[in-house]
A protein has these predicted regions:
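Extracytoplasmic
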Residues: 108-110, 191-193, 217
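Hydrophobic membrane-insertion alpha-helices, especially the h-region
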Residues: 1-13
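Extracytoplasmic low-complexity, Pro/Thr/Ser/Ala/Gly-rich segments
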Residues: 15-90, 97, 133-188, 239-244
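Short, cysteine-centered beta-strand-loop-beta hairpins and adjacent loop/turn segments enriched
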Residues: 90-107, 201-216
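Contiguous hydrophobic, core-forming segments of folded domains
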Residues: 104-143
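A short, structured loop/turn motif at beta-sheet edges
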Residues: 78-82, 114-122, 187-192, 224-228
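Residue-level signal for mature regions of secreted extracellular proteins and peptides
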Residues: 80, 103, 128, 212, ...
Length: 244
């Protein structure tokens, strides 16, 4: 009798822990959805302010969206006048101990946010959750931009800050055009500021959405400040842009 009671209690504990973990996982997911919607609401307010101030260029508005969402891929459909931001969000939670483990875990969700301004009205947003695979390219772009920033921070150009020079730094092998992860569009130095515009691409080699046949790409404007006091290299800033 006792073994049967113990066995029943054991399986009840397993069921209860599983039920609690499902609840915590769903709670983490719901928090991500709330975060995505809150970010979209903040962005709409910022877009309205930018438009009211006369700053309505596509690159400016892209920067506003990026500032309030941190989304690595932001596209603009000029015909429909719609900005679309694709990005991954993640949240940690703690699972109850079970037969096969427990402890810290993470949920990830892919969100697509669209921003449109109708004639005579303000900006509006729509947030949609997509399959995690839809954010593969966005995740790859985000990782690649970090690489470009680090490469620019370590770039010693001996005052020859050129497009070809940065292209060699980012692509020393010289890949074929279709396979290039990075295409340097321009490098301009004004005083101690070096500004580069780089097209960052997921061609599918990184396992992102490009592996399904579509190339995901995003232009970024990167800036490095030279000659910092004490020889300290200032972090390179990177902001997505539409015009490349």
């Amino acid at each position: 009798m006792i073994p049967a009671v113990l066995l029943a209690y054991f399986w009840y504990s397993v069921w209860q822990a599983g039920h609690e973990n499902d609840r915590r996982r769903q709670e983490a997911h719901d928090s991500l959805l709330r975060q995505a919607r809150a970010a979209a609401d903040r962005t709409v307010g910022a877009l309205d302010e930018s438009a009211a101030g006369g700053n309505g260029g596509a690159d400016v508005l892209t920067g506003v969206i990026w500032e309030h969402t941190g989304t690595p891929v932001i596209s603009y459909d000029e015909e429909r006048r719609v900005f679309t931001a694709v990005g991954l969000r993640s949240a940690e939670y703690t699972e109850e101990m079970q037969l096969f483990g427990g402890g810290p875990d993470m949920v990830q969700r892919c969100f697509v946010s669209s921003y449109v301004r109708r004639p005579g009205a303000g900006w509006t947003s729509t947030v949609t959750e997509r399959d995690i695979e839809a954010c593969g390219g966005s995740r790859w772009i985000e990782s690649s931009v970090r690489f470009v920033r680090k490469a620019m921070e370590g770039w010693e150009a001996d005052d020859q800050w050129t497009r070809a020079g940065l292209q060699r730094v980012l692509d020393p092998v010289g890949q074929a055009d279709d396979d290039r992860r990075f295409v340097v569009r321009s490098v301009v130095r004004r005083g101690e500021n070096v500004v580069a515009v780089v097209l960052v691409r997921d061609t599918g080699l990184g396992g992102g959405s490009g592996s399904e046949g579509a190339v995901v790409e995003q232009c970024y404007r990167l800036q490095r400040v030279l000659g910092s006091p004490g020889g300290v290299v200032e972090p390179v800033t990177a902001v997505p842009v539409v015009v490349c």
